[in-house]
């Protein structure tokens, strides 16, 4: 069993305080604050942003595994996770995560791609950990074969 470690350090009260988030690998060492949770344009991160990054990364790796297992090698996968953070009553909640992925995958058809993307969403370990949260998926196939053909046609017209 693998165990991954992350640490949060905080100084001060909730509103004026601030802290640092680090991970065991050393790859992340960033400031965070209450203000960075509620206001755009802050130079610090927040737990929701990091959760979105973790979910986007996990889902994308799961989709790559699904595609590879079905005999397709993706040229590129690009996923954005939008995490909705809302005040409900006296508390804040993560109410929804929207995954939006686009992919260049030679030779895969739309039906197969959509089925594999749905399976990746369902079985990604982070999706499973967030089962109490509504998770939606919009998957767009930018077929690499078609893109190449369109580029060749456009170049031929000049």
Question: What are these regions, as identified by a protein language model?
Answer:
Residues 1-53, 60-158:
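Extended beta-strand/beta-hairpin segments
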């Amino acid at each position: 069993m693998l165990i991954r470690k992350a640490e949060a350090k905080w100084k001060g009260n909730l509103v004026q305080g601030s802290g640092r988030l680090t991970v065991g690998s050393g790859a992340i060492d960033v400031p965070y604050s209450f203000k960075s949770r509620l206001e755009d344009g802050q130079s610090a991160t927040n737990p929701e942003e990091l959760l979105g990054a973790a979910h986007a990364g996990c889902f994308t790796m799961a989709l790559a595994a699904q595609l590879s297992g079905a005999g397709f090698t993706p040229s590129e996968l690009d996923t954005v996770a939008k995490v909705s953070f809302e005040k409900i009553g006296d508390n804040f909640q993560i109410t929804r995560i929207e995954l939006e992925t686009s992919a260049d995958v030679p030779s895969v058809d739309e039906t197969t791609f959509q089925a594999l993307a749905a399976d990746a969403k369902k079985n990604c370990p982070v999706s499973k950990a967030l089962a109490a949260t509504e998770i939606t998926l919009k998957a767009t196939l930018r077929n690499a074969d078609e893109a190449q053909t369109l580029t060749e046609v456009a170049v031929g017209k000049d």
